[in-house]
Amino acid sequence: MGHTRRQGTSPSKCPYLNFFQLLVLAGLSHFCSGVIHVTKEVKEVATLSCGHNVSVEELAQTRIYWQKEKKMVLTMMSGDMNIWPEYKNRTIFDITNNLSIVILALRPSDEGTYECVVLKYEKDAFKREHLAEVTLSVKADFPTPSISDFEIPTSNIRRIICSTSGGFPEPHLSWLENGEELNAINTTVSQDPETELYAVSSKLDFNMTTNHSFMCLIKYGHLRVNQTFNWNTTKQEHFPDNLLPSWAITLISVNGIFVICCLTYCFAPRCRERRRNERLRRESVRPV
């Protein structure tokens, strides 16, 4: 009896086809690796290069487009430049430096992929002469978060709050203890409409009768920042409530009052006699 072949394991009829496919994939990988990546901080200056040169004489026959995700940034047609409103007064076109654009005072919204397209007039038509892509990453580092704590009245529960602000991109906050993620009470993330920067805060309740070590971890993009909060219980003797029954407390109180009365009765005559002797002594020494 012959062996049956499992489906999907038939040998290739044309091994050269697989080799050709590998060559195509390698070529695509090489092409994709040509994308330029630029990373800058908020409010910094970013220079995005088109990687192509055009002489002054060729400008009249050349069209240059800079766009971000299909939205126009800048155009140069027949030597006339036009900058779109979002980039006006903060974008410079550097023709002599590989047709680069220079974006001033970076905003978080400037992040994205930019395309530079160069068209040249040839044989009664504009044909594409060059295409380049530049990926711009804009970041703002979050400061080390702060953790404040306060006690909730009439309970053994304590609450801690972790917060930080002024970072980008959008953060994700989590609480960890011994490597395990905990459930927070309330986590809020907000973005300033003007600066486009984020703020984040979160609350966590815990039982203050046991020791704890919490980590507040904030991830944003490929970066992270964290703060640790340690709680150590104080070693105190805890006496049970109502150590003595009420009748015993009453008996002790009555006995205490009785002892005080006895002491007063015993010492009162001595005090009176001492005062009487003092009075007689003063009278005996009084001059006639």
Swiss-Prot record:
Effect ascribed to mutating residue 271 to S: Loss of costimulatory function upon T-cell activation
Phenotypic consequence of residue 262 to S: Loss of costimulatory function upon T-cell activation
Tissue: Expressed on activated B-cells, macrophages and dendritic cells.
Residues of the Ig-like V-type domain: 35-135
GO term, biological process aspect, one: cellular response to lipopolysaccharide
Cellular component terms (Gene Ontology): cell surface; external side of plasma membrane; plasma membrane; protein complex involved in cell adhesion
Cytoplasmic side: 264-288
SMART domains, per the entry: IG
PTM field: Palmitoylated by ZDHHC20; palmitoylation protects CD80 from ubiquitin-mediated degradation, regulating the protein stability, and ensures its accurate plasma membrane localization.
Membrane-related topology note: Single-pass type I membrane protein
Signal peptide boundaries: 1-34
Residues in the Extracellular compartment per record: 35-242
Lipidation (S-palmitoyl cysteine): 261-262, 266, 271
UniProt keywords, alphabetically: Cell membrane, Disulfide bond, Glycoprotein, Host cell receptor for virus entry, Host-virus interaction, Immunoglobulin domain, Lipoprotein, Membrane, Palmitate, Phosphoprotein, Receptor, Signal, Transmembrane, Transmembrane helix
Any one GO molecular-function label of the UniProt entry: coreceptor activity
Residues glycosylated per entry: 53, 89, 98, 186, 207, 211, 226, 232
PANTHER family documented for this protein: T-LYMPHOCYTE ACTIVATION ANTIGEN, T-LYMPHOCYTE ACTIVATION ANTIGEN CD80
Summary of subunit composition and partner proteins: Homodimer. Interacts with CTLA4; this interaction inhibits T-cell activation. Interacts with PDL1/CD274; this interaction blocks PDL1/PDCD1 binding and thus PDL1/CD274 inhibitory function. Interacts with CD28. (Microbial infection) Interacts with adenovirus subgroup B fiber proteins.
Official protein name in the record: T-lymphocyte activation antigen CD80
Gene, per the UniProt record: CD80
